[in-house]
Regions:
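Positively charged, low-complexity terminal tracts
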Residues: 1-104
């Protein structure tokens, strides 16, 4: 049993996170950086519709980075970032919980 960060996600939060991660994935791919963590996290989020999201430390930091970049883009273009802010704060405030995996 490992300890991972737990976030309760709904459909809108899920779509915002996937959108932000796709942008980071594209940027990393263009720059020739390793994209394994980002790709795995996008696939993990795409498989799950709603509900519980368990994040490792690398996935947590990648999610915060991606949402922050999306927020900066919105602010630069003069758009509101209220929805992104709420998702970002929820992920940043996430707490550790025991995670047993699929084979409970």
């Amino acid at each position: 049993m490992t300890r991972m960060r737990y976030v309760k996600m709904d459909r809108i939060m899920n779509h915002m996170l996937i959108h932000a991660l796709r942008e980071v994935f594209r940027q990393e791919k263009e720059q020739g950086l390793p994209v394994d963590t980002t790709r795995d996290l996008v696939l993990k989020r795409a498989e799950q519709e709603e509900g519980k999201l368990y994040l490792t430390e690398a996935e947590h930091s990648k999610s915060v980075e991606a949402l922050n970049q999306l927020r900066d883009t919105y602010l630069k273009n003069g758009r509101y970032s209220d929805g992104i802010d709420s998702v970002l704060l929820k992920i940043m405030k996430s707490r550790y919980r025991p995670y047993r995996g699929r084979g409970r």
